Amino acid sequence: MARQYADIYLRGLDEGCIAALVGYGYRLACVENLSNEFAEKARRLGLTVIRKRVFNPSSRSELLRSLHEINEVCVSVKPLSREALMTALRDRRVDTVILHGGIAEVDRHILQVWENAVELSVSELVECAGNVKGLRTLIAYCRKAVENEVPVAVSSGAASAAEILPPQQLAYVLAALTDLEAPVLNAVSTTPVTILRKDRK
């Protein structure tokens, strides 16, 4: 059976994005600001699109309040505090925890509660370009995830068609950060596809 590819984070969707995704061979995409019009256009071209909600909580209580609002969407959390991170990593309503330059440093306490998949977005990686400490922390999470066989999804985080990357290129991003020679194809196929196909009712 042919491998299915998914980009689990786009910030918007238009005709250019749809053309790029289909052209690169994606079968699924997850979009933060999604209109029904473009979702239908994508469907007609064989691309399944799912809505994404991204929460940026500063505390555990803020995250828990936000999670009451979810309804048949993919839920990603970009935690802005250690407390919010610890909650996001173990709450089963969270589909992915987005890694970013300001995330709390990984330690044994975080490893003890870490159950959910993490998401490495190229857009977040680019933002870390001038933040050496943040980049090191992000790389440490990627390596711990691979080491402990925690699911990792790599996404583009694209806001336009020009920022969408081929799935193999996304897979090489994770490989480069974790010193692996081969692209980590599961990060753009099995892991995000499993997340996006799950029953959300």
Residue ranges and their predicted role:
Residues 1-31, 36-52, 57-65, 70, ...:
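Charged catalytic cores and adjacent phosphate/nucleic-acid-binding surfaces used
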Residues 76-79:
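Short beta-strand elements of ligand-binding domains
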